[in-house]
Amino acid sequence: MKTLLVFLSFLTSISLHSQSSINAIDNYVCPPCNSSCDTIIFDKPGTCTHCAMPLITEKELKKKYPKNKKRKIAFYLQPGIEILDFAGPMEVFAYADFEIFTVSKTKESIISQGILTILPDYSIQDAPEADILAFFGGNAAQSFKDPEIIKWIQSQPNIEYHFSVCTGVFALANAGTLNGMTATTFHNALDGLEKNYPEITVVKDARFVDNGKVITTAGISAGIDGALHLVAKLQGFNEARKIAYHMEYDKWTPGEGINLSLDNPYDGFTNIPNLENYTGTYEYLDNTEVILKINSREKSLYAVVYKRNYPLFYLKKDKFINLNGDEITFIKDDNNRVIGFRSSRNYDTLYKKLK
């Protein structure tokens, strides 16, 4: 009897241990990227099959992304600010659904390049906390030597990323944020940055430099590249490509900068194998045809419909996704030759490869 009780106790402990092990198994999710995959749950680590973002555990999701929390980005605007410096990135972050607000030293209106009047949302006295601080060029040498502004930058708690465009880099340089890091700026300001801030390694031929949590860009239009890069880091490369397409900035060359960060949003996208196997002419809707060709600049595919190029975003082998979020799966025969594709919108239909 005693032996039986010991045996039953042993079985119970095994059962409890097994149950504990089952309960300890983590579910994995995609970091919020404002796509349908935000609600998909995965049973093992890896990348999202929809947007290709690295998966995180549900515990990490709750900790890093409180429910319905949008990333807040503060655009610091000074008198004389360069319009495209801030307007280009603002467009990118707006498409990415960031919560954007403007800050200046005071709430008085400022003039940008002598032509645009701007009324800031906040002054440095009443600005709310942000997740990202962004600074831009134009009259930067004078503005970013102001001790009140530098003190405000240094006093901001819980900043996740610092971002600068053009000579906005001097805000971060004067605040000490870039000490020991690598940076770039507007071409005419590179020598001054290198001479006056020896603690910063200055790069003279890069669209942007990513130190991990601090991103600096070259002048004016390069701010768009840097903003797309930050979106790629936070929401996935495919989301950044969609935004570039919608802005008709689809001549963007992804990753055309220096990435010193441990997280590279372009991993797995720059060397997609055998792209040429998918090219050709296929059947399409309403007895029309679609031509698939290589987009060599982005190392991906274009679908040509009615003479317009529509990007297809790579997910994994034989699987892409279009602008509408439809998954495109290429079907192969026994000899590993592509014979057509199926769309998740109507998976029963095989669109045959014609040539």
Question: Where on the chain are the PLM-derived regions?
Answer:
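Conserved Rossmann-fold dehydrogenase catalytic segment
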Residues: 203-215, 248-249
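Intrinsically disordered, low-complexity terminal tails/loops enriched in metal-binding residues
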Residues: 18-65
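A conserved active-site-flanking secondary-structure segment within enzyme catalytic domains
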Residues: 179-205
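Bacterial Sec-dependent N-terminal signal peptides
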Residues: 1-24
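Extended, subdomain-level signal for the structured scaffold at the beginning of enzyme domains
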Residues: 59-162, 169-177, 204, 221, ...
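Residues that mark the start of a beta-strand
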Residues: 70-72, 182, 213
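Flexible, surface-exposed loop/linker segments and immediately adjacent secondary-structure boundaries
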Residues: 167-168, 187
